[in-house]
Amino acid sequence: SVMVDKFGSASAHKANVDLEYKRNIERYEFLRWGQKSFDNFRVVPPGTGICHQVNLEYLAKTIWSSSGFINNKKVELAYPDTVVGTDSHTTMINGLSVLGWGVGGIEAEAAMLGQPISMVVPEVIGFEIKGKIKEGITATDLVLTITEQLRKKGVVGKFVEFFGEGLKELSIPDRATISNMAPEYGATCGFFPIDEETIKFLKVSGRDEKGIQLVKKYAKLQGLWEDYKKNDRVYTDKMQLDLSQILPSLAGPKRPQDKIVLSKVSDEFLKSLKSEFSQKNISNLSKVKGENFEMDHGHVAIAAITSCTNTSNPSVMVGAGLLAKKAAKLGLKTKPWVKTSLAPGSKIVTDYLTKSGLQKYLDKLGFHLVGFGCTTCIGNSGPLDKNISDTIGKNNLIVSGVLSGNRNFEGRINPFVKANYLASPPLVVAYALA
């Protein structure tokens, strides 16, 4: 529900939040009533972040415990945490070894009222991760590579389970990034097993120590613990990826699975002008009314650090901040035709960016906070400057958007921005400067 109406200033966040409340006041009042009226219904306040990122950072337990009855005798039960959500990227939590996926509103409401969710037992694809990640390679590069491979394989309606020695190289935020994009690679979910990284994340995110010990003990007793010694699990089929082969990448201009190696993006865009956008000429330099600059095919009109996919990952967010710091100290500035925005999936992101001293450099480049929630990747990028959109429309310019989101389908990001590329947050900053 967050729209990037205002951007590029310190007041943008407050202005967008005020508009969000104005547009959604009836919804929020209804949810508040629900929280007061039902014992088993809790509401995370508006402006807190994206539901599945909040679930990863605060709520999920991996192994759940509660009181129950066996043969009319009250006992304490332990069982794996599971979740269904009305956002397709609910799958993100599989990175923390919690089985979950997106469902429709009616299914979710039925589950809230105690009804079971039925499903056909799915095929399971085993995806082996091996090798080590090279320096400079991000979780975004990795997930775009995995998305490309799994789309080619065909995993619609199937579970994907990741295994192998290479998992030791992946933090929980890295795994969550991969699990998040399950809808884009077509799977019902992309699941990671419980291991020491799981325990480490539960500890650093402030989970209850007793609950953490339960996770470890339960997983080992039930055979759910990943020790990397051998994998005798039976899968429908298997795939493999060597982390050392991953290259810096983007995906676009219209689909998340269309990965392009960074060094070839310019050449591929020029090809797409003719093949995808039916342009006869590779250049159409056009003056922007009322401004002292011109725009052409390929100019980046939107640069958005956005969505749960990447803002949940501190390594790429800090990377974006460090790049902004270096650029600001060199006196570099964002191009005047670029609409910049920072919309994290939770308040934790701005907390560590501010405490580390990096937020001020992002601000200098125009990446001010615009809100906490889904924005550009669901089409809530907000309007471009009128003179810029008029120039694009009048001259049929194929301009670009670069976003750290998970979807870039044509017409989704902005009606005037036809070529959209998924990229890591550091690359979003770089393209805003280019």
Predicted regions, residues:
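Fe-S-dependent hydro-lyases/dehydratases of central metabolism
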Residues: 1-434
